[in-house]
Amino acid sequence: MHGTRLGTAVATLMLGAGLTLAGSATWATGPAGHPFQARQPDPSTHDALLVVEIPAGGSVKYEIGAEDGLLHVDRFVSMPVAYPANYGAMPGTRAGDGDPLDALVLTRVPVHPGALLRFRPLGVLRMRDAGQADEKIVGVPVDDVDPTYAGVRDLADLPSAERARIEAFFRVYKDLPEGSSAVTLHGWGDAAAARALIDDAIEAAGR
């Protein structure tokens, strides 16, 4: 009797797990398609869209596969540092390296990988990785998503400590393992500079 009940319970759990996994697979690759197929908002709104790959505070570098749209573990960050903001790719854009533009969005709590996050670009951190341009757009959620940042409209509104944290992370996060590509920082651009970079990347993606 007990064995029958136990077997039924296990079967139910396995079925539930299977349905959960099936639901996850549908979420990842179902009718919505590849996350990078999402479109950027109309430029007149001055908003942008991020596909979150790495949550704020994370030390695992996740990447969404360009081909399958699934979330892959690319590597673990070897340095004892964590991402200072939610990090990911901007769908519908193409940077100079052929990949979507990278962006960081500051939030009060970490955002789940794979989520689409509408944000307001505040500026751009100019970087080079292995000698190649590798700019990072920096922003905050739009007011409808989180009104906490309603007064933050441009780079000058962002506390200097936040900018320093972002700089410190990118300055050292590739120091280990030895032989990693060299990263150099080359100052900040304001919201207008970030918007111009985004517009160029949207145009490049449409070619």
Model-derived features: where do they sit?
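Hydrophobic N-terminal alpha-helices or hydrophobic patches in metabolic proteins across all domains
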Residues: W27-R207
